[in-house]
């Protein structure tokens, strides 16, 4: 198949590592959008960080929902590639993109319309609530870019070409880093400036993906982005992606109410500390998800090709790789927690 990297042959350790590193880096880049916003907005004060932190949980929830088509793409397209069925691979790719667009429009519309009652869950001061509502409404209009880019990323991961999403997402992050101080301080837009910078960066990532697929790669021999949904493919995608998306969404939902408790007990400082700490802690589970995603793409191709022994060896390899990194992060957070937190929010009241 055109543009595909065969994962059913060759050294397992090297293939997993080469596949996982760009995926992990891409996950860190997605996390870095929020951390970059917090690092710059932190210079405006803890109240501004609390405003975008309250929206950060909803951004996390949106990313969790987008996993339906990211995971759906990785497994459905990957299995089709392993089974040497290019027609199914192309159909699954088109269906995942179409479903991602539909869900993103519906979810983004809900967040935009109900922004005020959602943000008031946190019971913040009125001026912080107003900033958060404006920030959420700006971000919600860019959700189709995020969901479609997630589907594109899943398709590339399934094809064994995880470096492409990494470089594209990295370009978006660099643009966000450049635009954040310009919009926040240069144009004097404050928290709204961070939202506009992120919106432009995410839109740019989407456009680069479109250019890459249409003009450079012709992945899977080329496939239509949008298609009329068929029950066979749609049901399979939901069966594969919905459990992961539901679990992550419930996790984000629980954290939303933990944020309310933090706000009730500690005001905007409590909320800001909780949300920022969660973003930093996400380093660990973003890493584990990176390896998990690489393992999913690897298993999808090898399972469909009947290479069960490679599936088992890949699973054991992933366990010890993630175990080593998890131990390192635990030591870092336990012994250097204050220093890590102060990088993003320099106010001592937030981390002491």
Residue ranges and their predicted role:
Residues 173-207, 337-339:
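Membrane-interface helix-loop junctions in multi-pass transport and translocation proteins
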Residues 1-18, 198, 210-251:
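Interhelical loop/hinge segments that connect adjacent transmembrane helices in multipass membrane
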Residues 20, 27, 53-56, 100, ...:
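Residue-level recognition of transmembrane alpha-helices
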Residues 106-137, 328-352:
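Short membrane-interface helical motifs at transmembrane helix boundaries
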Residues 28, 32-50, 119-126, 182-189, ...:
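Helix-terminus/linker motif at the lipid-water interface of multi-pass membrane proteins
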Residues 49-109, 146-165, 273-337:
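Small-residue-rich hydrophobic transmembrane alpha-helices
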Residues 14-74, 78, 242-262:
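Signature of the first transmembrane helix
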Residues 19, 23-24, 60, 100, ...:
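Residue-level signature of transmembrane alpha-helical cores of multipass secondary-active transporters
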């Amino acid at each position: 198949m055109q543009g595909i990297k065969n994962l059913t042959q060759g050294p397992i350790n090297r293939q997993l590592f080469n596949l996982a590193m760009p995926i992990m880096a891409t996950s860190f880049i997605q996390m870095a959008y929020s951390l970059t916003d917090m690092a710059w907005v932190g210079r405006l004060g803890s109240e501004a960080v609390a405003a975008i932190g309250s929206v950060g949980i909803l951004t996390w929830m949106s990313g969790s929902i987008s996993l339906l088509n990211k995971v759906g793409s990785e497994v459905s397209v990957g299995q089709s590639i392993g089974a040497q069925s290019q027609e199914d691979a192309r159909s699954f790719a088109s269906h995942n993109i179409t479903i991602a667009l539909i869900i993103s429009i519906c979810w983004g519309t809900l967040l935009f319309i109900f922004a005020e009652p959602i943000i008031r869950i946190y019971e913040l001061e009125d001026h912080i609530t107003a900033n958060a509502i404006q920030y959420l409404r700006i971000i919600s209009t860019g959700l189709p870019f995020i969901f479609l880019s997630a589907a594109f990323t899943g398709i590339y991961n399934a094809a064994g070409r995880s470096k492409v999403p990494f470089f594209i997402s990295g370009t978006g992050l660099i643009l966000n880093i450049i635009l954040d101080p310009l919009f926040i301080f240069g144009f004097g837009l404050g928290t709204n400036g961070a939202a506009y910078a992120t919106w432009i960066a995410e839109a740019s990532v989407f456009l680069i993906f479109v250019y890459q697929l249409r003009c450079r790669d012709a992945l899977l021999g080329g496939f239509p982005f949008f298609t009329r949904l068929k029950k066979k493919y749609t049901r399979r995608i939901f069966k594969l992606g919905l459990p992961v998306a539901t679990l992550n969404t419930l996790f984000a939902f629980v954290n939303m109410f933990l944020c309310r408790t933090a706000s009730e007990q500690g005001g905007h400082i409590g909320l800001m500390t909780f949300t920022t700490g969660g973003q930093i802690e996400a380093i660990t589970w973003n890493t584990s998800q990176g390896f998990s995603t690489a393992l999913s793409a690897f298993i999808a191709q090898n399972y469909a090709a009947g290479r069960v022994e490679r599936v088992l060896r890949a699973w054991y390899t992933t366990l010890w790789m993630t175990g080593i990194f998890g131990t390192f992060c635990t030591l870092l957070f336990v012994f250097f927690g204050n220093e890590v937190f102060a990088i993003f929010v320099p106010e001592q009241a937030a981390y002491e």
